[in-house]
Amino acid sequence: MEKVGWYQLFNGKDLSGWVQKNGTAEYKVENGEIVGTTVLKSPNSFLCTEMEFENFILELEFNVDSQLNSGIQIRSISSPLIMKGRVHGYQVEIDPSFRAWTGGIYDEARRGWLYTLAQNEPARNAFHQGEWNKIRIEAIGDTIRTWIN
């Protein structure tokens, strides 16, 4: 496996290198941040990098509205031949709800929950509602690990 240094996915200026799939949410850049705005009654929307990665570590910061559900799709695909192009695959959950499963693994549009945080109280308490949070995702081989804050 060839090691490559850190690569900046977002340039802080515009959405070059990114494409929206499914749904009608609006994505824009404000003050060097990607801002997504939900559209009522729209199917799930996904902002996807145009690059593909096999083994990777992804680190980012996020802040999510307490009324929304979100996540970070990894190892996911969108093909017009499968589910009419719906993005599907692993999602690292961003869950501001009372159950607090941020960092759990959900199989979007397929099998559902693969790893909840139901039995992991320290992980459930790591997410800070209404604040910026940091997430680290390691996807190496067939292992996916996540950390919050």
Predicted features along the sequence, with ranges:
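Carbohydrate-interacting regions of secretory-pathway proteins
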Residues: 1-149
